[in-house]
């Protein structure tokens, strides 16, 4: 197999013919390598950034990195430290498509983080649908039918279970004006 030093040499060889190096790793063909392509919650955020940093050391063209990223501060640090020129977000934008806007506005606490749980990837592969465990309206965030309407009568709501579904139910009930106990 090829190693990082091989890819650094390859990057130097093809640099004159590319505009951007998009650095990722792993494989869909072998399960032990798939976890690097789409890092789960069991791996560090940005676990593949070191690869982009290594390629960036040997080329002058822009380098992008990807892999379990979603924390705006970490993304800024990757760019500021020179590890990459571009940070790519995938699943983090499925969880919260407004992440860049919220980060730019300094509203980090309002960002819904990706759990890296693979619901999105699993559903896409199994039946071609878009689903997310923390974004129940994935792909329809701007549709008016999903705006929270005020209740006709304020109620006390008890939500049993603090997992993603329970927390989303509690948030929705609270936004509608109900008194919520989670």
Language-model-detected regions and their locations in the chain:
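Flavin-dependent oxidoreductase catalytic cores
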Residues: 1-160, 164-180
